[in-house]
């Protein structure tokens, strides 16, 4: 995504308004604004969060919060479903990555009238000890739904589980990605096509345009994204 700042610098006031409105009209920016509105995304450069991985981050995304808002929930369902229908009309089933994408995946499967399953991070330690919950058959063409992509590790682990089960993973659709190079390389190596509703660049762009953050915060966020494992240490 090209930065709006480079194009806007030498424009008239009216042209600036037009460029801002045009930038805000993309799906990535529309959804980014919606996430910011419900505080599903928090940008706190001066009071960073600690992720489960141990990374210190000025950025936190909780897409599960979208489930609490009916209109936003419907928006996510419709947009994810639209992408699956347009890009993967041959899909036989939808699989969600536990636990964050179970609800989103089920919503998409319901909208498209497709079977649904979800993939655990590890097999259950009781009962049938299933890793994949559902009724997926060998040879099925499956689209994976994920809520968030950071390093891509857990997402691609689910893909591998489905492949081991005998399914053909034809693509993954997620609500959000940080766009870390390590994730992009991992998806490339795993031969998995990834499509997302929004991304880091769109969120930062919208947050700056709407006054959620200041320009100096943008520089700090970019520093973090360039080296997230070491930032803040």
Describe these PLM feature segments.
Residues 14-15, 23:
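Acidic, Ala/Val/Gly-enriched low-complexity intrinsically disordered segments
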